[in-house]
C-alpha cells in the first residue's frame, strides 16, 4: 500500500511538472535573448535582435501598455457596474419577469467576445440595421468598442459571484439594518457591498484575466492590447524576439494578479455569524420600481445575448453554406478535436484529483493542483508562443521535427489551457465524498485501484461528464491557440468564423458562429440547472 501510494505521489508530481513545462518556455527565450547580448560569436544575429528590440521599445511597447490599461480598466468598471447592480436586484427584490431575466443574464457567457464583436459591427455598420433605422452609425473600431464588447460579455462572472454572496451572506446584518431603518441605498453601500466584496473581488480578477487573455475582439476591432500585439509582432512583423518579450511581460503581470488574489484571500477574512443554508428573503418593489428594475435587467440581457443571438440566426438563415460540404468537414474536425482534448483532459484531471486526495499531504496536494491549474491563468496567445518556442528549442537539440506534428502540440496546449476547468469541476464532486468512505473501502479491500474504479468513479460519473462537457465547449470556442498552433490546412469553427468576419463576410461567419453559440448555450443552461439543484438541496 505504501509503495503504491509512493508511485501515485511521484506520478502526480511529474505529471504536474510536465504540464507546466511549456508555460515557462517563453522565459527560456528571454534568457536566450539576454545571453545573445553578451555573445560576440554571432554578430549578425545580435544586430538583428537589437534592431527588432529597438523598434519594439521605441514605437510599439508604450502603445501596447496604453491600450491594454485603457481596455482593462474600462472592462473592469463596466463589468462591475452591470454585474453587481443586476446581481443585487436579482438577490434582493421580486419584480416583473425576474425569474426569466435571472436566467437570461447568465447567457452572454455562451457567446465568445470575438463573435459578439463582429455581430455589433455588422449591426452598427453603414449598411447595418442601426444606420438604416436611425440614420447614423456607432464606430466600434476603438477602445470604447472593445470595452463594450468585453464588458457585456464578461459581466456574468461578477454577476454569478455577487448574486450568490448577496443571497446568503450577512443575513443578520441585513436584519439589523432594516430595524435601524436604513435606506435601500445605505443597505446596499454599507451592508451588501461589505459582505460580498470578497466574492466581487474574485469575480473582478477573473474578468481582468479574461480581458488580458482576449485576442479575437481586440484584434478584430483594431486595438493593440498585449494579446493582439503578440500576434501582430509574430505574424505581421515577423519579430519573434519582441513577441516573446511581450508574452513574458504579460505572464509576469498575470502571475502578479494571481499573487494579489492569493494574498487577499489569505489576509482578508470576514466572518458573519450565520447559517449559510439560509437565503435573504426577497422584497417586493412598488409598481414603478418593478418596471424600472425589469427594464434595466432586460436591456443588459438584450445587449449581451438576445440581440446578438437573433442577428446570428438571421444571418445564418441567409447563408447558403449550410448546404456546402466544407461547413460539415470543419464542424466534424472541430468536434473530433474537442472530443479528444476533453477526454484526455478529464482523465488527467481525475488522476490528479484522486492522487492529491489519497496522498493526504496538504503541501503536495496544493502543489499538484496549483501547478496543474496554472495553464488557465496564462493568456492563450502567450501560451501558444511559449509552446512554439519550447518545441523549436527541442527540435534544435534532438532533431525530432516535433513541429511537424503540430496537431498533437495543439491538443497538448488545449490540455494545459483547460485542465484547471476540469479540476474545478471534479473538485465539487470530491467535496461531497466523505473521507470515511475511502477509509472504509481501504479497510475492506486494501487497493487504490478498487477505490478508484469501484468506489470513486460511480460516485463521480456526473462530475466527470460535467468536466468533459466544459472542456469540450471551451475547446470549440478557443481562438488564439487554434490560430497559432493548428497545422496548415486544418481549420476549426472559431478560426473560420474569425477569418470570415475579418474579410467582412458577415453572412459566411454567422453559421460557424451560431453553431459555437448553440453548443455553448446548452452547457450554460445545464450548469445553471445544476447550480439551482444544489441551492435547493442546501
Predicted regions and their residues:
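Membrane-water interface segments at the C-terminal ends of transmembrane alpha-helices
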Residues: 4-41, 57-167, 195-215, 247-262, ...
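A short amphipathic helical element positioned immediately N-terminal to and/or at the very start
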Residues: 46-57, 313, 317-323
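Short cytosolic juxtamembrane segments of multi-pass membrane proteins
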Residues: 270-282, 437, 530-538
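Flexible interhelical linker loops that connect adjacent transmembrane helices
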Residues: 264-296
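Short helix-to-coil transition segments within interhelical loops
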Residues: 93, 166-196, 223, 359, ...
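Solenoid-repeat scaffolds in large eukaryotic assemblies
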Residues: 242-243, 441, 509-510
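Glycine-rich helix-loop "coupling/hinge" segments at transmembrane-helix boundaries
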Residues: 212-238, 477-506
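Membrane-interface segments at the starts/ends of alpha-helical transmembrane spans
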Residues: 54-64, 136-139, 232-242, 322-333, ...
Amino acid at each position: 500500500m505504501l509503495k503504491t501510494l509512493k508511485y501515485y505521489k511521484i506520478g502526480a508530481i511529474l505529471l504536474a511538472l510536465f504540464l507546466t513545462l511549456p508555460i515557462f518556455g517563453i522565459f527560456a527565450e528571454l534568457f536566450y535573448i539576454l545571453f545573445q547580448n553578451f555573445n560576440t560569436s554571432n554578430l549578425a544575429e545580435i544586430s538583428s535582435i537589437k534592431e527588432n528590440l529597438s523598434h519594439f521599445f521605441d514605437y510599439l511597447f508604450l502603445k501596447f501598455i496604453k491600450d491594454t490599461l485603457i481596455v482593462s480598466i474600462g472592462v473592469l468598471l463596466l463589468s462591475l457596474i452591470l454585474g453587481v447592480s443586476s446581481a443585487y436586484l436579482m438577490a434582493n427584490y421580486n419584480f416583473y419577469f425576474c425569474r426569466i431575466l435571472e436566467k437570461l443574464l447568465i447567457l452572454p457567457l455562451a457567446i465568445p467576445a470575438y463573435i459578439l464583436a463582429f455581430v455589433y459591427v455588422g449591426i452598427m455598420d453603414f449598411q447595418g440595421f442601426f444606420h438604416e433605422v436611425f440614420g447614423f452609425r456607432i464606430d466600434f473600431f476603438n477602445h470604447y468598442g472593445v470595452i463594450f464588447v468585453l464588458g457585456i460579455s464578461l459581466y456574468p462572472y461578477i454577476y454569478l459571484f455577487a448574486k450568490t454572496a448577496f443571497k446568503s451572506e450577512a443575513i443578520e446584518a441585513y436584519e439589523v439594518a432594516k430595524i435601524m431603518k436604513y435606506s435601500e441605498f445605505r443597505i446596499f453601500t454599507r451592508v451588501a457591498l461589505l459582505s460580498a466584496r470578497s466574492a466581487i473581488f474574485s469575480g473582478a480578477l477573473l474578468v481582468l484575466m479574461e480581458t488580458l487573455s482576449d485576442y479575437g475582439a481586440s484584434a478584430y476591432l483594431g486595438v493593440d492590447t498585449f494579446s493582439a500585439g503578440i500576434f501582430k509582432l509574430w505574424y505581421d512583423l515577423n519579430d519573434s524576439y519582441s513577441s516573446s518579450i511581450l508574452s513574458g511581460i504579460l505572464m509576469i503581470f498575470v502571475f502578479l494578479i494571481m499573487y494579489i488574489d492569493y494574498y487577499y484571500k489569505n489576509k482578508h477574512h470576514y466572518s458573519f455569524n450565520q447559517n449559510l443554508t439560509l437565503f435573504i428573503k426577497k422584497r417586493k418593489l412598488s409598481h414603478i420600481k418593478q418596471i424600472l428594475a425589469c427594464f434595466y435587467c432586460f436591456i443588459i440581457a438584450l445587449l449581451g445575448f438576445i440581440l446578438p443571438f437573433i442577428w446570428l440566426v438571421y444571418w445564418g438563415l441567409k447563408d447558403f453554406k449550410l448546404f456546402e460540404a466544407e461547413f460539415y468537414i470543419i464542424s466534424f474536425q472541430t468536434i473530433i478535436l474537442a472530443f479528444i482534448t476533453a477526454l484526455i483532459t478529464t482523465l488527467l484531471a481525475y488522476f490528479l484529483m484522486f492522487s492529491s486526495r489519497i496522498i493526504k499531504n496538504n503541501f503536495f496536494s496544493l502543489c499538484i493542483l496549483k501547478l496543474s491549474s496554472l495553464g488557465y491563468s496564462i493568456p492563450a496567445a502567450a501560451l501558444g508562443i511559449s509552446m512554439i518556442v519550447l518545441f523549436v528549442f527541442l527540435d534544435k537539440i534532438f532533431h525530432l521535427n516535433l513541429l511537424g506534428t503540430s496537431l498533437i502540440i495543439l491538443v497538448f496546449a488545449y490540455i494545459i489551457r483547460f485542465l484547471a476547468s476540469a479540476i474545478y469541476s471534479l473538485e465539487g464532486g470530491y467535496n461531497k465524498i466523505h473521507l470515511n468512505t475511502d477509509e472504509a473501502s481501504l479497510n475492506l479491500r486494501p487497493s487504490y485501484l478498487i477505490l478508484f474504479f469501484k468506489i470513486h468513479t460511480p460516485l463521480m460519473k456526473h462530475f466527470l461528464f460535467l468536466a468533459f462537457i466544459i472542456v469540450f465547449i471551451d475547446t470549440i470556442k478557443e481562438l488564439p491557440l487554434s490560430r497559432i498552433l493548428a497545422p496548415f490546412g486544418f481549420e476549426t469553427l472559431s478560426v473560420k468564423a474569425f477569418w470570415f468576419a475579418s474579410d467582412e463576410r458577415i453572412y459566411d461567419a454567422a453559421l460557424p458562429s451560431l453553431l459555437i453559440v448553440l453548443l455553448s448555450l446548452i452547457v450554460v443552461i445545464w450548469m445553471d440547472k445544476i447550480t439551482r439543484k444544489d441551492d435547493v438541496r442546501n
